[in-house]
Regions:
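Substrate-positioning beta->alpha
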Residues: 159, 190-191, 207-226
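NAD(P)H-binding glycine-rich loop region in Rossmannoid oxidoreductase-like domains
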Residues: 44, 50-100
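Conserved small/polar residues in nucleotide/adenosyl-binding loops
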Residues: 230-236
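N-terminal Rossmann NAD(P)H-binding glycine-rich loop of SDR-like oxidoreductase domains
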Residues: 2-22
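NAD(P)-dependent short-chain dehydrogenase/reductase
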Residues: 168-213
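Glycine-rich phosphate-binding loop and adjoining beta1-alpha1-beta2 segment
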Residues: 30-52
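Active-site Tyr-X1-5-Lys
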Residues: 150-174
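Conserved Rossmann-fold NAD(P)-dependent oxidoreductase catalytic core, especially the SDR/UDP-sugar
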Residues: 94-95, 99-152
């Protein structure tokens, strides 16, 4: 059985659609107050059989910071996708975001080891690579450089990655996916998908600088491959 954390998020919902097309059993973790209707809506973007596919998901309420709840969700799982994370660039969220992202990943890694999970796919971010000198190109081998201009979010994702690497050194079979800014059909009123709504309304401004973008559907498709074929040993994959 496949277990997905962050199933009601942008990446998690599109990933669930990909998984539900197979005969594999799938369980998704959500917070108690999360609304799964968004996932059904995402499914409807793909197919008229959205309801039938949506019914294949076993939903479990669990907090990533609650070990007992998380341990229950892991029972019977063989492969895990860790998509859940708090995304914020507001300095006032730093302490809670750092704790949530890092400790949540620590718990996932520890339970993957305890439950002998065959493969973990951890969704990180290009932000986890940090800023390079003179905006030099980056790849999967670019080392992290401590810098005061690294965002709190970037630091939280970098340290979360360190927990996954710790798990790898302890014998966990894992892959880390590092997408750029993820775009695609989702919650039009929040997150990166807001840009579509703003442009539709006639937003006529743009910022200087450069960035990378990737379609959420491509992210979901790429995530399936290294988990389906557990013998693949690419520890980190950048998606831009």
């Amino acid at each position: 059985m496949i277990l997905v954390t962050g199933g009601t998020g942008l990446v998690g919902s599109h990933l669930l659609y990909q998984i539900c097309q197979s005969e594999t059993k799938v369980r998704a973790i959500k917070r108690l107050q999360s609304n799964t209707e968004f996932v059904r809506q995402v499914f409807s973007y793909y197919t008229e059989k959205a309801d039938a596919l949506f019914q294949k998901i076993e939903w479990v309420d669990a907090d990533l910071l609650n070990i007992s709840e998380l341990d229950f969700a892991f029972k019977g799982a063989t492969k895990v996708y860790h998509c859940a994370a708090w995304i914020s660039f507001n300095p006032k969220h730093k302490t809670k975001m750092m704790y949530t992202n890092i400790e949540g990943t620590t718990n996932v890694v520890n339970l993957c080891l305890a439950h002998h999970i065959q493969k973990l796919c951890h969704v990180s971010s290009v932000a986890a690579i940090g800023n390079t000198i003179n905006s030099a190109p980056i790849d999967e081998k670019t080392p992290w450089v401590n810098s005061p201009i690294n965002s709190c979010y970037a630091l939280s994702k970098h340290r979360s990655e360190m927990e996954v690497w710790r798990g790898i050194h302890e014998g966990l079979n894992a892959v880390i996916i590092c997408p750029a800014i993820i775009m695609g059909p989702g919650k039009w009123e929040k997150g990166s998908s807001m840009i579509f709504k703003q442009v539709w309304k006639g937003f006529s401004f743009y910022a200087s600088g450069t960035n990378g973008f990737v379609d959420v559907r491509d992210v979901a498709n790429v995530m399936i491959q290294p988990v389906s074929y557990t013998h693949l040993t690419l520890p980190t994959i950048l998606l831009v």
